[in-house]
Amino acid sequence: MAGVGLAAVPAWVPCRRWGLAAVTFGFHHGLSTLLARKTERAPQWLRACRHKTSISFLSRPDLPNLAYKRLKGKSPGIIFIPGYISNMNGTKALAIEEFCKSLGHAYIRFDYSGVGNSDGNLEECTVGKWRKDVLSIIDDLAEGPQILVGSSLGGWLMFHAAIARPQKVVALVGVATAVDGLVTQFNQLPIETKKEIEMKGVWPMPSKYSEEGVYRIQYSVIKEAEHHCLLHSPIPVKCPVRLLHGMKDDIVPWHTSVQVADRVVSTDVDVILRKNSDHRMKEKADIQLLVYTIDDLIDKLSTIVH
């Protein structure tokens, strides 16, 4: 995989803005040691994620209104794209907001159609419709160059956004990136099970993150998702890409991020693995790694611009 860096243990350099350490990538010192910083030195965004920004709504003709929260600030802006049926108030979304506040960077987080405070019927939502949601946020709300941070399904959608808006999307950060995830999981089912789902029209997909223990996904949603698969050919994204993944992820195997890295055309791609992290990657060390990765990209982009 020429140009692809696989780093289970990032190295560190002093950060110019708030005195801790920012991530660089390569096989160097142990990550657990490097992340074991004293809490008293941690920036405010790591100590507490305060939910202060007011909710706004993006009105769209013939499409559901989208709930969002926005911080005005400098470029590049950051947009957080949540996971499947996740809203904009998750741990990662709030931590990134506090990080952006501390540096004065623009930031947007939002709810998909049919999720959270946004309008729309979840049962009618598809990968294609959520892709349109992301593009609406980029086109109608974001100003200037943007770093997209996608979690799980959001990681799949961020690649579609980068392909559709290459002039505006300048870097990608994926967390447990689930490119083609819905289709891949369905295709791994036994033939008899797939036939039964097709006949009934609903897939009760098991999930420990659902209160019912399953997500009820329409068969039509799975078939529609097939039109948005990316792993069957080179992914035409040329910007810097960072893919963070937990090796204990039992929803989207970490090998998926390696496969994505291999498919991406960009030569500036790093896969960063956390040995003991799960799919959600929401522990303190995971969040530190995420924001340090974003900070490193901001540094990199500033160097390129200037």
Swiss-Prot record:
Acts as an acyl-protein thioesterase that hydrolyzes fatty acids from acylated residues in proteins. Regulates the mitochondrial S-depalmitoylation of the nucleophilic active site residue of peroxiredoxin-5/PRDX5, a key antioxidant protein, therefore modulating mitochondrial antioxidant ability. Also catalyzes the deglucuronidation of mycophenolic acid acyl-glucuronide, an active metabolite of the immunosuppressant drug mycophenolate. GO terms for molecular function: hydrolase activity, hydrolyzing O-glycosyl compounds; mycophenolic acid acyl-glucuronide esterase activity; palmitoyl-(protein) hydrolase activity. The keyword Mitochondrion applies. InterPro entries: AB_hydrolase_1, AB_hydrolase_fold, ABHD10_acyl-thioesterase. Keywords: Hydrolase, Mitochondrion, Transit peptide. GO terms for biological process: protein depalmitoylation. Residues 1-52 form a transit peptide. One of its GO terms (cellular component) is mitochondrion. PANTHER family: MYCOPHENOLIC ACID ACYL-GLUCURONIDE ESTERASE, MITOCHONDRIAL, PALMITOYL-PROTEIN THIOESTERASE ABHD10, MITOCHONDRIAL. This is Palmitoyl-protein thioesterase ABHD10, mitochondrial. It comes from Bos taurus (Bovine). It comes from the Eukaryota. Its main location: mitochondrion. Inhibited by palmostatin-B. Belongs to the AB hydrolase superfamily. It holds the Pfam family Abhydrolase_1. Its EC number is 3.1.2.22, 3.1.1.93. The active site is at 152 (charge relay system), 249 (charge relay system), 279 (charge relay system). It catalyses: S-hexadecanoyl-L-cysteinyl-[protein] + H2O = L-cysteinyl-[protein] + hexadecanoate + H(+); mycophenolic acid O-acyl-beta-D-glucuronide + H2O = mycophenolate + D-glucuronate + H(+). Residues 78-177 form the AB hydrolase-1 domain. It is found in: Mitochondrion.
